[in-house]
Amino acid sequence: MASSRPPGLIQCYREELQARHYARRTVDTYEQWLRRFLRFHGLRHPREMGNEQVNMFLTHLAVEGQVSASTQNQALAALLFLYRGFQ
C-alpha cells in the first residue's frame, strides 16, 4: 500500500491561488517567482526567511538580472501573497 504524502509548499500555494480565482497564467507566473525565490535562497523554507531575504532577492533581480520595475513588482506580488495571503 502506497503512503500518501501531504501536499508540498508549492502545490498548496498553487491551490490557494486557484481557490481565490486567480487566472491560470497568474498562478503559473507566481509559482515561477516562488521557485526562483526558493532557489535563490538555497531552498530554505519561507518560514525561515522574511523581509530581508525578499529585499535581497528583489535587489538581485534589479541589479544582476536587470529586470524592469514592473517585473520586480510582479515578483513582489507573488511573495506578498506567500507571506500575507497564504501562510
Provide a role label for each language-model segment.
Residues Q11-R25, E31-Q87:
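N-terminal core-binding DNA-recognition domain of tyrosine recombinases/integrases
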